[in-house]
A protein has these predicted regions:
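Active-site loops and adjacent core secondary-structure elements that bind or stabilize anionic groups
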Residues: 1-138, 142-171
């Protein structure tokens, strides 16, 4: 037996939903999973892409340097190389057009060389476990760019999705 309770009073009001004419809300503990270092408020679409990015990178958490670029919940670039810098370059080469305005995620600390490459691309969100100080300062050069540190947390045990006139739950 499963039970689900959502308290509307704990929802964070977002700028808007998937489209500007829709209302958007987030129910959950974002701050337990991420430390926001810089940038504007996350949007509904940002949150969906961040979720997809975290789920994808979870497959490469303890692997060699890996970089992924996502847009509209889909990976448009993914590479694992000896250096994070090369992983980013190769991930971007996967689909540089779709990468514009996307979410970037790394499984390793972002160094200055990688940050210099990232800084040339318009991206909404950058996620990493940590940032070298000089890399962080460079990435903060775009005032609206959202920079997140992914904290060490467990993903929820249940996947919840709306479906038809109800919900699906899965472990």
């Amino acid at each position: 037996t499963a039970a689900l309770k959502i308290s509307e009073t704990n929802g964070k009001v977002l700028r808007y939903g998937e489209n500007p004419h829709q209302k958007g809300f987030f129910f959950g503990d974002f701050d337990a999973m991420f430390s926001k270092l810089h940038g504007k408020e996350l949007s509904y679409n940002n949150l969906l892409d961040v979720d997809a990015a975290v789920n994808l990178m979870g497959e490469f958490k303890n692997d060699a340097p890996t970089f992924a670029i996502l847009k509209h919940n889909n990976a448009c670039g993914l590479a694992q190389r000896e250096t994070l810098h090369q992983a980013y370059i190769d991930a971007l080469a996967g689909d540089p057009v779709s990468a514009f305005g996307g979410v970037l995620i790394s499984n390793k600390e972002i160094d200055k060389a990688t940050a210099e490459e990232i800084h040339q691309l318009f991206c909404e969100v950058v996620i990493a476990p940590s940032y070298a100080a000089d890399a962080l300062e460079l990435l903060k050069g775009k005032k609206n760019r959202i920079i997140l540190i992914q904290n060490e947390t467990e993903m929820p045990e249940m996947l919840v999705r709306t479906c038809l006139n109800g919900m699906l739950l899965q472990d």
